[in-house]
């Protein structure tokens, strides 16, 4: 009988401790679930604008349209991976503001399409583009932020870019030389997006997002490029992960 009483007392103490631990844990879960801030990370793929939609005076178009001095590459070669992060703040149940930063960089090898060295070797270059967008967005959540959360949004981006061409080139007199042409700077443009988030437990969400950006870097003729602009626009398809708090 004494043994049973001791077991019962131990069981009661254990139950009370579990209940005491469960109360603040439940309160914390409730607080997190209703939290309106989130830190997010994304991993995706950037599709550069194609030949038919690139801005006039685009340097890539210029490189492809020099007749016998044209370079051989595809615009699609500039498609590549992106990654980034963002901070979201809920303004109410149906609106949230976000600030984020992303990173994209791609190096594309090219050669002269119709010109080679006297010994038959190709005349090669590396074309490299880097884009770092800093964005501010407002998003509309049509069914609220609880459970599965679809959203659409728009905003503005400040785009840091760097474009370079490094390798061997042919000058106006037909001589081959080694050169390096670089242009970097900042430009601004609109961003539109849409996506959906799915809850995982009480504090995490995963989802997908489609984003479009429109911007162009200018002043490339100052650095002796063949075109004065570099089109930075295109679509990004992203996998997203967020931690709510």
Write out the residue ranges for each language-model feature:
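Cleavable N-terminal export/targeting peptides
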Residues: 1-35
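Short glycine/proline- and aromatic-enriched beta-strand/turn motifs that initiate or cap beta-hairpins
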Residues: 26-89, 236-245
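Predominantly the C-terminal beta-signal and adjacent terminal strand-loop region
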Residues: 32, 106, 192, 197-245
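Residues on the lipid-exposed face of transmembrane beta-strands in outer-membrane beta-barrel proteins
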Residues: 41-43, 85-91, 101, 134-140, ...
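Extracellular/periplasm-exposed beta-strand and loop segments of Gram-negative cell-envelope proteins
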Residues: 48-78, 103-133, 159-187, 215-236
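Repeated loop/turn-to-beta-strand initiation elements of outer-membrane beta-barrel proteins
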Residues: 94-97, 146-148, 202-206
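Helix-adjacent hinge/juxtasegments
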Residues: 125-128, 138-145
